Structure formats: C-alpha cells, structure tokens
Amino acid sequence: MDNEGIGLYPLHRCKTIHLVRHAQGIHNVAGEKDHSAYSSEDYFDAHLTPLGWQQVDNLRNHVRAAQLLNKVELVIVSPMLRTIQTAVGAFGGEEDTNGADATPLMVANAGSSDRPAISSLNSPPFLAVELCRETMGDHPCDRRRSVTEYKALFPAIDFSIIETDNDVLWKPSPRESLEEVAARGVEFIKWIWTRKEKEIAIVSHSGFLHGLLSSFGKDCCDDLKKELSIHLSNCELRSMVIVDRGNLGTDSAETTNYPGKVPEGLDNPSG
C-alpha cells in the first residue's frame, strides 16, 4: 500500500507550537517608507504602534475563541519590547484592575504603550529566550535593552535564562545570514525538546521565524514547502506540530498511552 506523504508517530514524541510574529512596530512603518530607517537609532528596540496594539487585541480575541489559553502551557518570547508587548497582550490575563493579587505581566504604559497594566492572573508562565531573537546586526531596532529595564516593565516574565544584563549578542556588523539564523532556529527547536511542556506559544520575529521554517520540510511536497516558506504577517499565528524522530527529548511527559495487561493474563499475539 502506498503511504507516500503520510507520517505516523507516537503522540508522546510530538509537541504543538504556536508561532506568532509580533504586531506592527514603529520600525515597520518607517521601514516600509524608507528601508534605510531600519539602520536608524531612532528605532532602537522598537515598540508597537497604536495599530499594532489593535492587532494584538484581535489576536487576543482569536486566542480565546480558539481556547488556546486552556492548552498553552508556556509562552516563550524574544526579549524585545515589540515581542513582549505582543505576547502579554495576546496571552496575558485581564487588565490589572481592582488590585488583583497577582504580579503584573506588564505595568501601565510600558514601552510608550498608553495601555493599562496586564495581570498574570490565570495566564500561562512567560519565559524570555534569546535564541528566538530577530536576525542580529546592523539594525538598532533588533538590539535589546538591559534585562533590568525589562524586569521593571514586565515583572512577571521569567528572564532567568538570559545570561547577561546588557545585550552582548547584537553587533553593528555583519548582519546574520539566513543560514546562520536557520541554524539558530534548529538549535532553538532542539532546546524546545528539553522542555517538559507539550504545547507552547512562541512570540518572535519575521526573520527568525522565516529562517526557522526554511530549515524544515525539505522532504515534503511542493505545496507544503511553499506554505512553510511564506513570511508571517504582523501578529499572525501559525500552529505547527514538531516530531522527535530521534532521541532529542525524554519520555517523562504525560502520555495518553495505557500499558494494558492490567491485570495480567494470557496474551495471544494473533488477536
């Protein structure tokens, strides 16, 4: 029987990831008009535009309608203003009002947002990870500020695995190549397999996500290759399944498998 194009894998070797590109940032607007604006210090660690926040609100509505908040066990976010604002706006708790006894994910007006504080109440944990940052080099909009500054703006986000307070990864030149970003993407996916969570949201950037997706699907049909190669729009969400076809992860995660033979008895292999 021809099973070409079909894959069958044990569920405990699969994870679901929801890839999200950040909403519109001030650098996107400037760069659309003049690409050289990406090299301007005016857009250092760019924050979201008012339109970008509208996009976040719409994504938030979708996340709730699709009941993703009931499924997502962890939100991984690139440590940049625009990605963090997108992540907490889409996956965070309600507006932090009435003195709710929960550490805020975002304080009021963080990053010139003109938005109220966002609570961590009833939201999944958030983890900042440098591996999923945007293509590094040349563009100041892709250089992060200190972790100390971010912690003051986003108190409930876990920045503990970021090794240095200041940004030591971004260099003025050269800018990372697509091949380098793709390699970083593969490293990121391998790291995902060290996590116990089975369903994870990842809020990142166009260049990184394109590099990541371009690393996979080489053995797929042309339509699927094309689907993987399309750049994500601002605030777009794409859900994917990743499969451990080697032994990258562990079998410690919960599984729906059941061992059988409880209680033990005769076990005829013919039936």
UniProtKB/Swiss-Prot annotation:
Active site: H22, E134
Residues marked Transition state stabilizer (site): H205
Pfam families: His_Phos_1 (PF00300)
Name of this protein: Phosphoglycerate mutase-like protein
Induction behaviour: By auxin, sucrose, oryzalin and the nematodes Heterodera schachtii and Meloidogyne incognita in roots. Down-regulated by abscisic acid (ABA) and hydroxyurea.
Lineage, broadest ranks: Eukaryota, Viridiplantae, Streptophyta, Embryophyta, Tracheophyta
Task of the protein: May play a role in carbohydrates metabolism.
UniProt cross-references to Gene3D superfamilies, sorted A to Z: Phosphoglycerate mutase-like
Disordered as annotated region, ranges: 252-271
Stored SUPFAM superfamilies: Phosphoglycerate mutase-like
Tissues in which the protein is found: Expressed in the shoot apical meristem and meristematic zone of the root tips.
Protein family membership: Belongs to the phosphoglycerate mutase family.
